[in-house]
Amino acid sequence: MTSRRVKATIIVAAWRAEDTLSRSVRSALAQDIGSLEVIVVDDASPDGTSRATRELMAVDPRVRLLTLDRNGGPSAARNAAIEAARGEWLAVLDSDDQMQPERLLRMITFAESVGADCVYDDLQPVDPEGRPLGSSHLAALAINSPQKWPIERFLTGCRALPGQAALGYLKPVLRRSFVMQNGLRYDTNLRNGEDFHLIAELLAVGGELWFLPTPGYLYTHRDGSISRRLNPDHARALLHADKAFCARHVDTLSAEARRLMRQRDRNFADLAAAEIAIRAIKSGKLLRATGTLLRRPSAAIRMFRQIRGGLARRRAV
């Protein structure tokens, strides 16, 4: 592989992934893209994640394994893979998700035809057995053709609005030369929402982002998924990262982009307060819940929506 040009590097950050990794990596190896490599980064897993990866390596030399000495989260794992990658394009794949076989060929061919630095496609939620769950993530937007997304469009879809199909869940395919030339890396302080900040940074430094409406990424929906409910500590980290982003690009962000970031921050602050209040109620700490909502009344509406949504999901089971 070292003597051949590698078209794509598929990055799989893995933690406690021994039960799901094989299917994910096999979907990566099945990509009809020619020369590729799959880099699995074992994020100091306490299980057999590394062993499962070595079993895959024994069957297919395109699989590579990196191991981290201590758990650093998905950002640290992906950054390690970016440094080691040889592909012209970088594709992010979670260790319990899959891709349709033609996904990367379609996305990279399109990206090269328009000069994109990053391309998204839609994702299809599936159950742990790979069965589709409803419509695709962005089906309600009724996008029928490729779209170029400037930073304002991207931020519009990442405001943490109740019921919003957030663009931050989409998985990017990135031009590695642009990533390296601009020093783009995942924020290792984030355990949630790290993809948003990478793409926001790419756009802020002049990168070109396109969206393809075909759902080629299969997102596994699991109870207790980290992206299902937001830990208040993670929300605070996101707010800090948002403020740092705006400060870095204060001279280049448009007035509309700054307005959207302020709205995003208000919504995340509401979400964090609502989560704190819900946890307090569940623990029987009603005074703490009341105090949290009195300090941020706008979070009360968010809390009641979350409770109503949780009850609706229970009735549906």
Language-model features and meaning:
Residues S3, H197, A204, L209-V317:
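C-terminal subregions of glycosyltransferases and related glycan-biosynthesis enzymes
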Residues M1-D233, L311-R314:
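Nucleotide-sugar donor-binding/catalytic module of glycosyltransferases
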